[in-house]
Amino acid sequence: MNINATLIGQSVAFFIFVLFCMKYVWPPVIAALHERQKKIADGLDAASRAARDLELAQDKVGQQLREAKAQAAEIIEQAKKRGTQIVDEARETARVEADRVKAQAQAEIEQELNGVKDALRAQLGSLAVNGAEKILGATIDQNAHAELVNKLAAEI
């Protein structure tokens, strides 16, 4: 194979093509590759930031959930304490009311007892006078001896 003008012409054309490609085609291709590489790096950074943000959000949600559970437990405990307090107050109110009713009933019983005692004393006085009349066989003046009968009834 001889080196002739065709081979030299083809070599010159190839060399010019390579220079043209290096000068005009290669820089935009390299720029596109660098831009694509930068976009990929930015996407990876954004993905790692998103992963960190997701992890932080999950931690925050977990913390808020724990706080909500603690707050709910505290509210339940306060409700239990308030319920116990209400029951104790109702119990105390019922006890006071029962004591009041008991004292009122006791006073009514005492009043009724005093009334019955007075009635019994009055009857006892007249019975004593009647009994004394029958025993003595004479009439006793009830008005004259009322003071004596009242003293006797008071002693009884």
Swiss-Prot record:
Spell out the Pfam families in the cross-references: ATP-synt_B
Per the record, its GO cellular-component terms are: plasma membrane; proton-transporting ATP synthase complex
Concerning InterPro entries, the annotation shows: ATP_synth_B-like_membr_sf, ATP_synth_b/b'su_bac/chlpt, ATP_synth_F0_bsu_bac, ATP_synthase_B_chain
Q: How does it sit in the membrane?
A: Single-pass membrane protein
Query: Has keyword Cell membrane?
Result: yes
Report the principal subcellular site: membrane
GO terms for MF: proton-transporting ATP synthase activity, rotational mechanism; proton-transporting ATPase activity, rotational mechanism
TM spans (from-to) = 12-32
Q: Which UniProt keywords apply?
A: ATP synthesis, Cell inner membrane, Cell membrane, CF(0), Hydrogen ion transport, Ion transport, Membrane, Transmembrane, Transmembrane helix, Transport
Give the subcellular location.
Cell inner membrane
What's this protein's family per the entry?
Answer: Belongs to the ATPase B chain family.
HAMAP family for this protein: ATP_synth_b_bprime
Function of the protein: F(1)F(0) ATP synthase produces ATP from ADP in the presence of a proton or sodium gradient. F-type ATPases consist of two structural domains, F(1) containing the extramembraneous catalytic core and F(0) containing the membrane proton channel, linked together by a central stalk and a peripheral stalk. During catalysis, ATP synthesis in the catalytic domain of F(1) is coupled via a rotary mechanism of the central stalk subunits to proton translocation. Component of the F(0) channel, it forms part of the peripheral stalk, linking F(1) to F(0).
Subunit record text: F-type ATPases have 2 components, F(1) - the catalytic core - and F(0) - the membrane proton channel. F(1) has five subunits: alpha(3), beta(3), gamma(1), delta(1), epsilon(1). F(0) has three main subunits: a(1), b(2) and c(10-14). The alpha and beta chains form an alternating ring which encloses part of the gamma chain. F(1) is attached to F(0) by a central stalk formed by the gamma and epsilon chains, while a peripheral stalk is formed by the delta and b chains.
What name does this protein carry?
ATP synthase subunit b
Read off the lineage from the record: Bacteria, Pseudomonadati, Pseudomonadota, Gammaproteobacteria, Pseudomonadales
**What gene is it encoded by?**
atpF
